[in-house]
Each structure stands twice: as C-alpha cells, then as structure tokens.
Amino acid sequence: SERGCAYCGAKHVIGTPMKDVIHISHGPVGCTYDTWQTKRYISDNDNFQLKYTYATDMKEKHIVFGAEKLLKKNIIEAFQAFPDIKRMTIYQTCASALIGDDINAIAQEVMDELPDVDIFVCNSPGFAGPSQSGGHHKINIAWIDQKVGTVEPKITSDYVINYVGEYNIQGDQEVMLDYFKRMGIQVLSTFTGNGSYDDLRAMHRAHLNVLECARSAEYICNELRVRYGIPRLDIDGFGFEPLSTSLRKIGLFFGIEDRAQAIIEEETARWKPELDWYKE
C-alpha cells in the first residue's frame, strides 16, 4: 500500500514535500506510482513537487546487466527538462539496491559534470526497515549527514527556529508561520513541508528546533542537538488549547512570552464566538 515500506516512508512522507526539487526513484515504475499524489502537501511554487514525479523505470534487463547508465541518463534528462530546477533527490528502491547500483557515485559524477546542480541520495529501499517508519529514520539521518552545514543562511532575527515534522498538508503550515512571524521569529527552514532544499541545508544555524511530528522527524532533531547543540521543543499545533500551550512554550524559551500571549488573546477573541456556538 501507499504506507507500506521504508522507501515510501522516506520519499512519500518526508522527501517529496520539498518543493524546489526533482524527486526521482531509481527502480521499477510501480514504486514511483505508489508514492505520488496521495498526499496534499502543497507548495508556493505552483505545487511543482506534486505535479511531476520521475522514475528510471528499471526493467528485467537492468536487473541482469545493471542500471547505473540508465540512472545517469535519467538524471541529466530531468535537469534538461526543467532547467530552472537545480536540486534533485534520488531514492533507492529494492530493485536497484539488490543489484548494488552505486547511486552515490553516479550522483557525484553528475555534480562534477554539472557544477550548478546539487543532488541528495536517499538509500532507503523498501526492505530497509519493518515499515515506513524505518524510512523516516533513514532520510532524517541521511539529510544531516550529507547536506546540513553546506549552506550558510542570512540571519535576520534574534529568534531563529527550524520548524520540523510539519508537511503543509492542505496548507496547514501557513497558520503557524503567521504566528511565528508575529512573534518576531525567523523560520530558517521547514522540514519538509513547502521546504526549500537550500534552506534545509542551513538547519545548523537555528537556535531551536520546533518539532510537530515526533514520529517522523525526531531523529534529525536529536542529531542536531548532538552535533550542533540545538535544543528540541515538541509542540502540538492542532486544537485551541494545545496550540496556545505550544506558543507559550516557544515564547518562554526565547523570553518573549508577552508576544505569545498577545497572539493567544487576539486569536481567542476572534474565534471564541464561533467555538461557543458549538458548545450551545
């Protein structure tokens, strides 16, 4: 099913919400079809990552003779088809993993030939874990190993966060980003809903990791704490009281509780009449 394997947990849940990226699966076309268009993680670049998906479409002959040449051909063709997109994620599948295709080497070869592109390799074939949760872990760790720390961001606030484990399902992220902005907080990156590839390379410069979905993204938060000393703060942005509590926790961390409380009071006054209607 669409929620079945470690490959799915890496690509479908966490990888594909990144908006400015060509997402290509190295394997049979069925793997790609199974992880396309069943989640509504919209983006502000006309939903590029939802409209297009890519597969190397491995066949039986590639299992016998190898598919590295096929992969390189597909990578170059994809960049040529979308010249404005300079970032790519390649996802390993069971088929390409079992025959030992060296995806990392091919990715590096292309980056050497096309110096303006950058490629992330996610080695999380379907058999790599007992369920899709195994893929969550693998892509979390692969991202921090390969990409975090390779871009230096512009810091514009005294309060800087990564918003982690939020996938912008039908635009729900926009509500929280509005609250953060009103509190004077700079959101350095969103992992990974409506997230920008290069912004996510700069996660190491945040002051705090604000974590929404621990089940899918606590791994990168824990590693950011170990490697860069960035604290982790778990929140719940769904529900009136949980959201209020979450804003207070963030405000307390930065010493701006008054800003959080002002937003809570303003939004309570705005929505309380409608909530009271349901209680009648």
UniProtKB/Swiss-Prot annotation:
Keywords: ATP-binding, Iron, Iron-sulfur, Metal-binding, Nitrogen fixation, Nucleotide-binding, Oxidoreductase. InterPro entries: Nase/OxRdtase_comp1, Nase_asu, Nase_comp1_asu, Nase_comp1_CS. NCBIfam families: alt_nitrog_alph. Belongs to the NifD/NifK/NifE/NifN family. The structure of the 8Fe-9S-C-homocitryl cluster is assumed to be analogous to the 7Fe-Mo-9S-C-homocitryl cluster. Hexamer of two alpha, two beta, and two delta chains. This is Nitrogenase iron-iron protein alpha chain. It comes from Heliomicrobium gestii.
